From Swiss-Prot:
Belongs to the RtcB family. Pfam families: RtcB. This is RNA-splicing ligase RtcB homolog 1. InterPro entries: RtcB (IPR001233), RtcB-like_sf (IPR036025), RtcB_euk (IPR027513).
Length: 506
């Protein structure tokens, strides 16, 4: 690999507009398409500082800078359009988190890469609304936070309380939210307000290892640790009244609940198993990549198909997981307010995935094409009138749920036509890390983080207090910059801003 100085690297990066940058071919070897990334002035500085630091003599180890990872993805076989870096981008395994790429299904050389989905398959967010207001919740805020903490199993080794045996797990992996509906854990309309209606039909549990199933069985209906959370939130601003009203959000001060979780150890094992198989497939099929973390297989190879079927099962696991936590959240609220979830109007606004690969139809060079779209740390954001979004949102565009860092605001956005054309209907997913977990642990004290949250009037319940500094707001980019950048470039539109009043974490 040629090592260039920082100024030479910059000759390959060109500003297209105030908030968008082109990465030219040649920045990394064998690029089939260009790269693009979106950043405002503050986010841009973080991107270029990361690149500058990587150019220093003796800088080895760790992940490559985000711009390099975008360019390495642009060199993968079968990629179309551009390799896209969203404003929340940060270095990850293979693909950067916040990197999106689409591959032509009709090209026999096209690949699927587990690094383009991530280890937490279908890590995603679900948002529930209520008919409660901040004034209703404030007097019982601490009790409600405790009730949620008591109802939802949280933390690294947390075990689920939803009854589950091996046969149930097989069915849940195949059926996704249809299993949750049959078992009485969700309402029929919950499914309607869920990406893919909460079920990937391509799931095949027989392609999942026994080890993954063993890890997954006790974890269904658990929040986990890391950046996962359940938050009680207050509607602080409404930017698009019409779209918000379609979501059942009419007034400031309304209470919502956001659940952010994924496929736990199950998804991690599916990804780990696939990477081992794909390294063998790459040797056999003579596939070369710029980075060995970009292990991949031809989409139509046995390994590629096996991964997609197992990944779909992990996606279903995550939807069942969020559904189980929806059930527990409704129970906690009903118990606290001595009424029913129905009377509290606890409907699902939407549920989105942040880590997944899916076959979708997009326009490429003026013609519709079937593409395998990898979204890692990015969110599907389809525009109004798209056939794959619910009837309720046909006139507004798909809701996009963007979680902030702990104690900061979250946002609901909507998909746009421009996003469909520029980013294959994709936008940001969250704040995006600016400090690694190790640096966060070194630089921040968890007691200070907890004190800051209390000073903001936020109730906090956390299973592992010492993990809190990894998720402190100072470890992340400012989610407001991320969301505003997406809004300004037109790939999504701001709809609702939510402020946390209680945070439940692993």
């Amino acid at each position: 690999m040629v090592v260039r100085d920082y100024n030479t690297e910059l000759t390959y990066i060109e500003r297209i507009s105030t908030n968008s940058f082109r990465i030219k071919k040649g920045f990394q070897p064998n690029m089939n398409v260009e790269g693009i990334f979106y950043a405002n002035s503050r986010l841009e500085k973080l991107m270029f500082d990361e690149l500058r630091n990587s150019c220093r003599p003796g800088m080895t180890g760790g992940f490559l800078p985000g711009v390099k990872q975008i360019a390495n993805v642009a060199a993968l076989p079968g990629i179309v359009g551009r390799s896209v870096g969203l404003p929340d981008i940060h270095s990850g395994y293979g693909f950067a988190i916040g990197n999106m790429a689409a591959f032509d299904m009709s090209d026999p050389t096209s690949i699927v890469s587990p690094g383009g989905v991530g280890f937490d398959i279908n890590c995603g967010v679900r948002l529930l609304r209520t008919n409660l207001f901040e004034k209703d919740v404030k007097p019982v805020q601490e009790q409600l936070a405790q009730s949620l903490f008591d109802h939802i199993p949280v933390g690294v080794g947390s075990k689920g309380i939803i009854p589950m045996n091996a046969h149930d797990l097989e069915e849940a992996l195949e059926m996704g939210m249809d299993w949750s509906l049959r078992e009485g854990y969700v309402w029929a309309e919950d499914k309607e307000h869920c990406e893919e209606y909460g079920r990937m039909l391509t799931a095949d549990p027989s392609k999942v290892s026994m080890r993954a199933k063993k890890r997954g069985l006790p974890q269904l209906g658990t929040l986990g640790a890391g950046n996962h959370y359940a938050e009680i939130q207050v509607v602080e601003e409404i930017y698009d009244k019409y779209a918000a009203s379609k979501m059942g959000i009419e007034e400031l001060g309304q209470i919502c609940v956001m659940i952010h979780s994924g496929s736990r150890g199950f998804g991690h094992q599916v990804a780990t198993d696939a990477l081992v198989e794909m390294e063998k497939a790459m040797k056999r099929d003579k596939i070369e990549t710029n980075d060995r973390q970009l292990a991949c297989a031809r989409i139509n190879s046995v390994e590629g198909q096996n991964y997609l079927k197992a990944m779909s099962a992990a996606a279903n696991f995550a939807w069942v997981n969020r559904s189980s936590m929806t059930f527990l959240t409704r129970q906690a609220f009903a118990k606290q307010f001595n009424t029913t979830p129905d009377d509290l109007d606890m409907h699902v606004i939407y549920d989105v995935s942040h880590n997944v690969a899916k076959i979708e139809e997009h326009i490429v060079d003026g013609r519709p094409k079937q593409l395998l779209v990898h979204r890692k740390g990015s969110t599907r954001a389809f525009p109004p009138h798209h056939p794959l979004i619910p009837v309720d949102y046909q006139l507004t565009g798909q809701p996009v749920l963007v979680g902030g860092s702990m104690g900061t605001c979250s946002f609901v956005l909507t998909g746009t036509e421009k996003g469909m054309a520029e980013t294959f209907g994709s936008t940001c997913h969250g704040a995006g890390r600016s400090l690694s977990r190790a640096k966060s642990r070194r630089n921040l004290d968890y007691k200070d983080v907890l004190r800051d949250l209390e000073a903001k009037g936020i109730s906090i319940r956390v299973a592992s207090p010492k993990l809190v500094q990894e998720e402190a707001p100072d470890s992340y980019k400012d989610v407001r910059d991320v969301v505003q950048t997406c809004h300004d470039v037109g790939i999504s539109s701001k709809c609702i801003k939510l402020r946390p009043i209680a945070v439940i974490k692993g």
